[in-house]
A protein has these predicted regions:
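Enriched for short, Lys/Arg-rich terminal
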Residues: 76-122
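Acidic, glycine-rich loop-and-strand cores that form catalytic or ligand-binding grooves
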Residues: 42-48
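Short, surface-exposed charged micro-motifs
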Residues: 5, 63, 73-75, 86
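A short, surface-exposed loop/turn module that caps and links secondary-structure elements
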Residues: 49-73
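Generic, well-ordered alpha-helical segments
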Residues: 29-36, 52, 56, 68, ...
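A generic structural signal for short beta-strands and their flanking turns/coil linkers
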Residues: 40, 60, 68-72, 83, ...
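Arg/Lys-rich, positively charged N-terminal/basic patches that mediate binding to nucleic acids
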Residues: 1-42
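Short, solvent-exposed coil/turn linker segments
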Residues: 48-49, 60, 98, 105
Length: 122
């Protein structure tokens, strides 16, 4: 079964998304938030295409603007939490879609790059 493949923008982000210890450190010791991050990453990896994530209301998949145009965010846990996973859909050659019309590409995207996990609205 071919699932969504995740590419990480850097090693630090990869460690934060795959290590309970690193994720807990990122969230200031909040182990529940860290476990939620790892669960979100697992769900992304198990999806057939990115559309499977977009249609999940609890993920609150939404586009970003300004300097992050072409990127999207999903909640690490809930909308009440400030933490977001910032990601970008990539084509089969691992290039960003330009333009990135998510409605047109969601059913075919099988690769995403996770740029960062951040307190996006601080």
């Amino acid at each position: 079964m071919i699932c969504v493949r995740i590419i990480y923008a850097n090693k630090k982000t990869e460690k934060q998304c795959n290590s309970l210890k690193e994720a807990t450190k990122l969230f200031g010791g909040d182990k529940k938030l860290a476990m939620s991050l790892l669960a979100r990453i697992n769900t992304i990896e198990q999806a057939d295409v990115i559309k499977d994530i977009i249609v999940m209301p609890t993920f609150r998949f939404h586009n970003l603007k300004g300097k992050l145009n072409g990127y999207f965010a999903i909640d690490v846990k809930t909308i009440r939490e400030k933490w977001r996973i910032i990601l970008q859909p990539l084509d089969e050659q691992e290039h960003a879609f330009d333009p990135c019309n998510i409605d047109e590409i969601a059913a075919i995207v099988k690769i995403v790059e996770i740029r960062e996990v951040s307190a996006h609205y601080e």
